[in-house]
């Protein structure tokens, strides 16, 4: 798991390889990731938007921006947490994701919180001995 804390808000990411959705012979590798956001600050905040930078093993960079996460803009009171899952396809067997969320505080001011960088790697293949 990967974790970052900004202004008392903790973002934890747990990536996992989706072997059944991947087709390595077609250069299609798919990962899922579970994100948990915990508001350990003293104010209510709302997640407004997201930004991801996805880099594959060849150095190709894809940027993704959008409103909220999985169609929602959750409000987190102090002590609340929010969890969601999403996915990412790549044409290489490894890559890196990093990003940030745009948040809004009680006073309406917006600020960014860090999504920690995390690696997407195909688990080592098990060797079968005959």
From Swiss-Prot:
Residues 3-127 form the ApaG domain. Coiled coil: none annotated. Pfam families: DUF525. One of its GO terms (biological process) is error-free translesion synthesis. This is Protein ApaG. It comes from Brucella abortus (strain 2308).
